[in-house]
């Protein structure tokens, strides 16, 4: 095991205006919530480069086929009624779903993203959307916030 000094470890400043999901279990597909309401963050008209900090406190992998696709989505609609684009995605779950050599466990994940689509369009409104697949009993519990890169 090697030691990484505090100078070289990234730190992420929490800003409640950039909170995308608070603690709460997700057992079916849908948008993330803060205070029991769907959370949409307006990052303005310009480019936004950041890291989505995802702290997983619990993840169900009991039946061996669970999958959780955590997406950063952008839209030009403040309600996400139209123009929805997946900007970044993280897949967690059983190794059968993720294609990894081991099942995922609780812990911090950092997902780099920006608010530009593949066509170069800048999306002002952002949210987290979770797609849940296969046999789910309890689901996944995590919090998520964005940290803007300077």
Segments predicted by a language model, with ranges:
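Surface-exposed, low-hydrophobicity beta-strand/loop segments enriched in small/polar/acidic residues
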Residues: 1-150
